[in-house]
Regions:
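Hydrolase catalytic cores
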Residues: 96-98, 226-294
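Active-site-adjacent substrate-recognition loops and nearby beta-strands
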Residues: 134, 180-197, 202-219, 231-246, ...
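C-terminal subdomain of the subtilisin-like protease fold in secreted/lumenal serine endopeptidases
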Residues: 162, 212, 268-355, 364, ...
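Subtilisin-like peptidase catalytic core
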Residues: 79-157, 282-288
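Substrate-binding/access-modulating region of protease and related hydrolase catalytic domains
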Residues: 123-195, 238-241, 245-246
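Active-site core segment of subtilase-fold serine proteases
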Residues: 25-114, 143
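Secretory targeting and sorting signals
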Residues: 1-23, 355-372
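C-terminal region of N-terminal signal peptides and the immediate post-cleavage residues
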Residues: 13-28, 64, 339-350, 370-380
Length: 402
């Protein structure tokens, strides 16, 4: 893989786009059958669910995302003033198509092909992504109707309070947050995947084999296919409009799609219960039970929709209320505890942001973003007060490799 390193401290783990082969794109999307997506579509296709893709922007002219799949969003950082509907890099478009691709004429089909994509660009024309831009993008998405926030990115920078606040803002507004563990094959998971309550997604290959380049750690929650994933990209990136990629970015998008299916199947269900369904119905992908490599296992959208799973009042991955400084296990088999450097973190105060499939850059137009209207689901009880951490110097998000 080609490595790209820019000045800064946040990484985007990406892979080189490869033109798809002559056979139909759908036939190359092995991950859909591996996850049982066709069966899941008999019960839910994601209709009415808004998934925010905080990334490089989303090309709303891509055939598999045209016709209303993508609504105008917003841009932050160097993409400020845009609607997020242009993507000169392809990463955001690829993630959006994995989530909600319409599969036009045998093209890229998403896990939730009737969901709506809300694009949030956090950088333009290859400029550096800042933690501030990512945090602002998350907050904006939550305030503009997102049911699920997809963060196919990770950081190796020092944790910033604004990023932590943004993710907690999502939790407080009943939004499911999904993030990748990273693609360096190391035993370290950066932010935002290491924030307690986030669905931290590692990668698998065919036959439930763990993907060797996934970052691992006690924060890992779920896994999904991450090797040889075919999705749509802008034709300005690959002239066929499709590419094959590796990375936990793709795995993250697939889990976001699964979350959208559950939210559509149970429109009154709170985010905590959606998370609970996804983790309790996952298929063991490594050793029996939860482990640091694939978490609770590979996501199973069909089981998550159809299994008899009790609703819960609070996110089973979140910190339990406590009256002392000692850690208290959360209420429903959370990711195994490690020493905390901050009350809301399970992996120390290191943060990092990696996009796991294609490099994130954006070109956009200056239009005001559309405010999505929807009826909010009942909000889960608020989490206990969170102690703030000292603000570090502003860190920049690097693109480390394709």
């Amino acid at each position: 893989m080609l490595a790209r390193v820019l000045l800064g401290a946040i990484a985007l783990a990406l892979c080189v786009p490869v033109p798809a082969q002559a056979q139909s794109i759908r036939d190359q999307q092995w991950h859909l059958d591996a996850l049982g997506v066709p069966k899941a579509h008999e019960h839910s296709r994601g209709k009415g669910v808004v998934v925010a893709v905080v990334d490089s922007g989303v090309d709303d002219t891509a055939p598999d995302l045209a016709g209303g799949a993508v609504v105008p969003g917003a841009g932050f950082g160097t993409a400020a003033g845009t609607t997020g509907t242009r993507d000169t890099d392809g990463h955001g478009t690829a993630m959006a198509a994995l989530i909600a691709g319409r599969g036009v004429s045998g093209g890229a089909l998403g896990v939730a092909p009737e969901a709506t994509i809300l694009p949030v660009s956090v950088g333009a024309d290859g400029e550096k992504f800042t933690t501030t831009a990512v945090a602002e993008g998350i907050t904006w998405a939550v305030d503009h109707g997102a049911d699920v926030v997809n963060l196919s990115l990770t950081s190796e920078a020092t944790l910033t309070p604004d990023l932590l606040r943004a993710v907690n803002h999502a939790f407080d507004h009943d939004v499911v947050v999904v993030a990748g563990t990273g693609n360096d094959g190391v035993e370290h998971i950066g932010a935002p995947a290491n924030i307690r309550g986030v669905l931290a997604v590692a990668g698998t290959e065919r036959d439930l084999v763990p993907w060797s380049d996934s970052n691992t750690g006690p924060e890992t929650v779920l896994a999904a296919p991450a090797k040889g994933i075919v999705s749509a990209v802008p034709k300005s990136v690959v002239d066929t409009g499709y590419a094959e990629m590796d990375g936990t970015s793709a795995a993250t998008a697939l889990v976001s799609g699964a979350a959208a299916l559950v939210r559509a199947a149970y429109p009154d269900m709170n985010a905590a219960s959606v998370v609970n369904r996804l983790i309790t119905t996952a298929t063991d992908a490594d050793v029996p039970g939860r482990d640091d490599v694939t978490g609770f296992g590979q996501v199973d959208p069909f089981a998550a929709i159809t299994a008899d799973v009790a609703d819960v009042a609070r996110n089973p991955l979140a910190p339990a209320p406590r009256t002392t400084a000692a850690p208290v296990p959360s209420s429903a088999t959370p990711v195994r505890e490690r020493a905390l450097n901050g009350p809301a973190w399970s992996g120390g105060a290191r943060a990092g942001v990696v996009l796991g499939g294609l490099l994130a850059i954006l070109v956009g137009v200056t239009v005001t973003g559309l405010l999505l209207s929807r009826v909010r689901r009942p909000v889960s009880p608020p989490l206990p007060p969170r102690a703030e951490i000292p603000p570090p110097p502003e860190e920049f998000w690097n693109r480390t490799r394709w």
